[in-house]
Each structure stands twice: as C-alpha cells, then as structure tokens.
C-alpha cells in the first residue's frame, strides 16, 4: 500500500490511542494504593510530539515505546480518523489494498474508536457525526469520492 500522505510503500503504521481514565480505573485497588503513596506520576505517560508512550509501574522498570503516532487522552474521533484512516482510505480509492486494525485488551476503547459510542448505534438514536468512529467516517469519505 502506498501512503498518500507520507509517500511510503508497503509499510505498516502503528498508532496508539490512549483512552481517558474511566470510573472503573479510579476504583481499582492498585489506583487507590498508588494515590495513597503520594506518587503523582502517571502510569501511562504520553508524549505526542515524540510519538512515545512511557509505562510505569511501582517496583518495575519503566518501559518506553516509540510508535509512528500517539494520540493522547483528549484526542477526538475526528483527529483519530485523520491520523489513522484518511491516508489508508485515500490509498484504497487509488486502487491499493488497505487495512485498519484495532488491537488491545478488553476495555481499552477499540469499539469506541472503530464504531463510536454504543449509544450512537441504538435504534432510533440521532446520528452525531462528531461521535462517529472510523467505519462511518471511511464510508462517508468513500461515498463523497464516488459522487
């Protein structure tokens, strides 16, 4: 596949999107113990400029991962689409193959990123473009191209 935005051929790009903390995260015993210890360090530190993620856990060595792109906790669905999918869909429209894959642990936001919030898909719900995931946005881009 040729990435129209970066001019690369046949390359797999790795992008991480770090989701915001949810209620369950804060209620975990480890989170409570971490807060009691007085440590204010985040266990997942995001550096979007360097496209890196630093993982910290008490009593373990920190691990840094440098990727092609990193989207922080405040990344919108639109920003995510622009970074992750627009170039792939552009290449597909030019006749190349393209795949977008969401991978990760349960509860990390894959479904939200790909489809949008589950409430968005309930029967009778009003569509809200700003909440749309990658699939809806890709379909819209393809249909706009076809017109």
Feature roles, as predicted:
Residues 1-55, 60:
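Long, basic/Gly/Ser/Thr-rich N-terminal segments
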Residues 40, 49-147:
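P-loop NTPase motor catalytic core
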């Amino acid at each position: 596949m040729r990435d129209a935005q970066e001019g690369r051929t046949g390359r797999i790009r790795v992008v991480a999107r770090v989701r915001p903390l949810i209620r369950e995260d804060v209620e975990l015993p480890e989170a409570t113990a971490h807060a009691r210890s007085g440590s204010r360090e985040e266990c997942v530190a995001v550096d979007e400029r360097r496209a890196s993620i630093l993982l910290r856990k008490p009593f373990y060595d920190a691990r840094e991962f440098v990727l092609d792109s990193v989207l922080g906790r405040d990344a919108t669905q639109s920003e995510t689409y622009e970074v992750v999918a627009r170039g792939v869909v552009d290449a597909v429209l030019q006749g190349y193959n393209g795949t977008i894959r969401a991978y990760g642990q349960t509860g990390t936001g894959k479904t939200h990123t790909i489809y949008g919030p589950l409430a968005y898909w309930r029967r009778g719900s009003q569509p809200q473009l700003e909440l749309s995931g990658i699939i809806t946005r890709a379909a819209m881009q393809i249909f706009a191209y076809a017109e």
